[in-house]
Amino acid sequence: MAEDAPVVQQTMLEPEVLLKKRKVNERTRKERVEQAIAKKEAQKKNRKETFKRAETFINNYRQRERERIRLNRSAKNKGDIFVPDETKLLFVIRIAGVKNMPPKIRKVLRLLRLSRINNAVFVRNNKAVAQMLRIVEPYVMYGIPNLHSVRELIYKRGFGKINGQRIALSDNALIEEALGKYDVISIEDIIHEIYNVGSHFKEVTKFLWPFTLTPVKHSLMEKKVKHFNEGRKAGYCGEEINELIKKQV
């Protein structure tokens, strides 16, 4: 009889073990439900914030454009020429250079992240960048992108660098995870930061993978720059860069 006691005790313990396990499972399930609800609420809040920001950005862009048009008209009426503030944003496209490049040229192109022909990047227009562009001028075209070009490039050709991989900017959650600490939580925030050369321009451009553009015919490039670049096929092209972007996006 004494030998049967452990069996009886084990039988009595089984319901208690199952009950504890059931309670743990219920608690875990409840926590998951609560987490899912909290995540859904956070996503809803972020969507509202994203829409609100986008609306604010668009209103600001429109206001700036109206002011630019007003100043331009006012200058024309007075017989003057309206000269806008020095541009802060440039878009650089690599158009040449494969073999027999001097080491210095190759190094600067690498610093600009233009490792291949038809790679392109946004850069801040400052003294250091201007010096680099002068060095590689025979191998690049660069100019002033407008808001439409910035939007088209980021929406259609934009990829982010996440864990060393090239990831499409198709989910704001990925953007928030990578750039949320800079208060950049959506693709519209990226556009705003780039176009306005904001305080976190460096972090955002570093996050963006260099753009890969569609090749265009050599004659088109020559035509685009000939009249303002003395027949050269490379270099600064001002706002004409937007026509080239339109062909290559």
UniProtKB/Swiss-Prot annotation:
Task: Tell me one GO biological process term.
Answer: assembly of large subunit precursor of preribosome
Indicate the transmembrane segments per the record.
Answer: none
Q: Which UniProt keywords apply?
A: Cytoplasm, Nucleus, Ribonucleoprotein, Ribosomal protein
Does the record carry DNA-binding as a key word?
Answer: no
Identify the GO cellular component terms for this protein: cytosolic large ribosomal subunit; nucleolus; preribosome; preribosome, large subunit precursor
Q: What is its main location?
A: cytoplasm
Report whether Ribosomal protein shows up as a keyword of the record.
yes
Question: What is the annotated quaternary arrangement, including any partners?
Answer: Component of the small ribosomal subunit (SSU). Mature yeast ribosomes consist of a small (40S) and a large (60S) subunit. The 40S small subunit contains 1 molecule of ribosomal RNA (18S rRNA) and at least 33 different proteins. The large 60S subunit contains 3 rRNA molecules (25S, 5.8S and 5S rRNA) and at least 46 different proteins.
Q: Anything else the record notes?
A: There are 3 genes for uL30 in S.pombe.
What function does this protein fulfil?
Component of the ribosome, a large ribonucleoprotein complex responsible for the synthesis of proteins in the cell. The small ribosomal subunit (SSU) binds messenger RNAs (mRNAs) and translates the encoded message by selecting cognate aminoacyl-transfer RNA (tRNA) molecules. The large subunit (LSU) contains the ribosomal catalytic site termed the peptidyl transferase center (PTC), which catalyzes the formation of peptide bonds, thereby polymerizing the amino acids delivered by tRNAs into a polypeptide chain.
**Stated family:** Belongs to the universal ribosomal protein uL30 family.
Name of this chain's protein:
Large ribosomal subunit protein uL30A
Origin species: Schizosaccharomyces pombe (strain 972 / ATCC 24843)
